[in-house]
Amino acid sequence: MVSQRSAMIFAILCLFALPLAGQHQSTKPKPRVVVVGVNGMELDILRPLLLQGQLPNLAKVIRNGAYGKLRTVSAPNCPRVYTTMFTSTRPEEHGVTGFLVGGITANTNMLKEEPIWSILSKNGVTVGMANVPATFPVMPVNGYMVSGMLTRGKSCEDGVLCAPKLSEVEGGDAVYPKEMKAELLKNVGDFYIDCERMPAAADLKGHESEVINKWLDKVQLIREQQTKLFDYVLTNHPTDFTWIVQSCEDRTGHWLYPIAPFNVGYNPKIETVRPDAFPDQYIQFDKVLGTILKHVDENTYLIVVSDHGIKPLREFEETDPHAHMDHEKTTPVIAKHDFADGDDVPGAFFAMGPGIKRDLRLMGFEASVYDIAPTILHIYGIGQPEQMRGHVLSEIFESSENKVALQK
C-alpha cells in the first residue's frame, strides 16, 4: 500500500515537473561571446614569437580553436575596416570610408548600415563595447558602450589620431549610459581613450633616444589603463556580447617596423634605440589577453581579430613633406598607408569556444572581415540580414547548425 501510494505521488510529481522542464528549456541562457580586437596584428609576424613560447595566452587559444589570416578591405585603415566588421558591408555602403569623410573625422553619425551591436540589442542580447574604433559618439545599446579611436577631445584636429582623457571628451558622448562615465572615472581613473600617436620626424631629429623612450613609456601606460578598463567592465558589467579593442600595437608597429629591407624609411638612429619595442608590443598584448582569458570559461566564445597587418608608415613622412596632409594640403590626416591592396597586409583571426574545432588552421583567405558579424549572429541564432556581404565561418564549427535560437 505504501509502495503504491509512493508510486502514485512520484507519478504526480513527474507530471508537474514536465512543464517545468519545458519552461527551463525555453529560457536557456544566451551564448556568451567576447571579441578582442587588435589593431595592426599580422599572423606571419607572430609566428616566431609563438614558436619561441613568448605568446603563451595566444598559443592557448590556437590549441583550443581555429586560426588563420583574415582578409581585409582595400586601402585598409582602422575606421574603414572596423566598420566593415560591424556591418559586413562595403565601406562605400556603410559610409565610413576612412579617417576623414568629407573633411570631417569619421564618426557613428555617418553610419548608413546597421551595426552588429544594434542588431544584437534588438534581439535581446546584452551588449558591451569598450575602446572600439569608430564608435564615437556612442550609440544606445542594450548594455554599455565606451568609445575608442577617433574620440574627439580638447585640441584634437579633424582626422588626426589623438589621445584624449575621458574627462577631456568634446563634441559628443564617450560613454553610454551617461551615468557610467562617473563610475569609470572613480573606479578605472581618468584614462586615455586611445593610444598616443606617433611622434613627427621633426620632433625626433637629434633627440631620438629621449623622444622614443618617452613615447613608448606613454604607450605602455595607456595599454595598462586599457587593460584595467577591460578587467573592470568584464567583472562589473558582464554582458552576453562584449567587444573590446587594444589599440597600441598599430602605432608601435607602423612606426618602429624594424626590417630594414622592407622599410624605405629605415633610420638606424630610430630603430637601434629600442630594438625590443617591435616584438615587445605583441608580448605585452599577450599579457592583456591573459587578463581577458580570466573572464573566459569553457562556455564562452572568444574571437580575436585584427583589422589589418602591419607595414611602415614613416617612409612617407621622410620622402613626402605632405604625407600628413589631404589633397588640399590643408587638413591633417595621420599618414598614407603603403598598401592599397588589403591582401598585402592581412589581419589575423583566432576563435575558440563550445563547438569550435580545435587546432584548426584556416588556409589561404578562408576568413574575411566581412564574415565576423554573420558568424557572431550565427552563434546567437539570429538570421543574417540581406545587406550583409559576408558568410558564416561554418568551417570552424563542428556542426553547421545555429548554436542557439534566441527565445523572443
Model-based region annotation:
Residues 46-84, 92-93, 126-130:
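Short, structured active-site-proximal loop/turn typified by the sulfatase FGly-forming signature C/S-X-P-X-R
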Residues 59-63, 116-123, 290, 298, ...:
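Non-catalytic, well-ordered alpha-helical segments in soluble enzyme domains
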Residues 7-19:
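Bacterial N-terminal signal peptides
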Residues 20-24:
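Boundary at the C-terminal end of the N-terminal hydrophobic targeting segment
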Residues 26-28, 33, 44-46, 216-242, ...:
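A long, amphipathic alpha-helix that forms part
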Residues 107-112, 279-283, 333-347, 358-373, ...:
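A short beta-strand-to-alpha-helix junction
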Residues 89-269:
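His/Asp/Glu-rich, glycine-adjacent segments
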